[in-house]
């Protein structure tokens, strides 16, 4: 259970880093938002899911 928690936290950190770098690049590029809108929304949805997963797993670890 601890390993699953650690992997989910690691995935959350990596995804957060990718979104912090990627979203401004997509918004700054010409015609980037209209072509990459689904990718940004998918990344944001995955991030929200990981936040809830980390919270749920944390309740089992603590």
Swiss-Prot record:
Keywords from the UniProt entry = Chloroplast, Membrane, Photosynthesis, Photosystem II, Plastid, Reaction center, Thylakoid, Transmembrane, Transmembrane helix
Q: Specify the domain of life of the species encoding this protein.
A: Eukaryota
InterPro entries to which the protein is assigned, alphabetical: PSII_PsbZ, PSII_PsbZ_sf
Membrane topology is: Multi-pass membrane protein
- Where is it localised? Plastid, Chloroplast thylakoid membrane
The principal location of this protein is: plastid
Membrane-spanning segments: 8-28, 41-61
Give the organism the record lists: Staurastrum punctulatum (Green alga)
- Give the matching SUPFAM superfamilies: PsbZ-like
> What function is annotated for this protein?
May control the interaction of photosystem II (PSII) cores with the light-harvesting antenna, regulates electron flow through the 2 photosystem reaction centers. PSII is a light-driven water plastoquinone oxidoreductase, using light energy to abstract electrons from H(2)O, generating a proton gradient subsequently used for ATP formation.
Protein name per its UniProtKB record: Photosystem II reaction center protein Z
Quaternary structure? PSII is composed of 1 copy each of membrane proteins PsbA, PsbB, PsbC, PsbD, PsbE, PsbF, PsbH, PsbI, PsbJ, PsbK, PsbL, PsbM, PsbT, PsbY, PsbZ, Psb30/Ycf12, at least 3 peripheral proteins of the oxygen-evolving complex and a large number of cofactors. It forms dimeric complexes.
Family the UniProt entry places it in: Belongs to the PsbZ family.
**One CC-aspect GO term:** photosystem II reaction center
What biological process terms from GO does the record include? photosynthesis; photosystem II stabilization
**Record-annotated disulphide pairs:** none
């Amino acid at each position: 259970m601890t390993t699953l928690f650690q992997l989910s936290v690691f995935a959350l950190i990596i995804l957060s880093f990718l979104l912090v770098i990627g979203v401004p690049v997509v918004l700054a590029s010409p015609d980037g938002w209209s072509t990459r809108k689904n990718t940004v929304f998918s990344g944001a949805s995955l991030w929200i899911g990981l936040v809830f997963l980390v919270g749920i797993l944390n309740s089992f670890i603590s």
